Amino acid sequence: LLKEFNFSTNIFNWEEFKLFDQYFERILVSKGTFLIKEGETERYSYFVFEGILRCWLLNYNGEEQTFWFCKEGTFSMSNISFTLQTRSAFNVQTIVDSVIYRIDKKQVNELYTAIPKVKTVFEDLNAILLNKLLKRNIDLIKYSPE
């Protein structure tokens, strides 16, 4: 995960890495499973270990419109709903059988207490993700055929 976002793996020592892993639950998720549906509030933060997720919604014509893919080594976009504890504006669904690690709010708070620098790292990861989303939106406008 840290390599995906160009973070140094030296941020945590070996003991912290082992402790970090204990807070996440490994789950196997079948193809086509919804991790969250539009209108629900996310109860977990998901990390994609193997597989791929798609983020989509119904457009004004009632057609499915995919706007983002969460690949291996990234967190699910449903983290927006999870972090803010607001209703999700979109669906997140597996498109292949996947191995996902998840953590709930209570475990996140315990993790932040056990390893305080994790909170800063997660905040930085969220900022990097937001920057990627903004860049994508700007590119769609900038390079539009209009």
Q: Residue locations for each model-derived region?
A:
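Short acidic/polar alpha-helix capping motifs at helix-coil junctions
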Residues: E15-F20, L53-W56, K71-T74, A114-P116, ...
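Polybasic "coupling" helices that flank or enter modular domains
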Residues: Q93-V96, Y101-E146
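Hydrophobic residues at beta-strand termini and immediately following loops
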Residues: I27-V29, C70, I103
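A generic structural signal for ordered secondary structure
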Residues: F24, I52, E64, I100-I103, ...
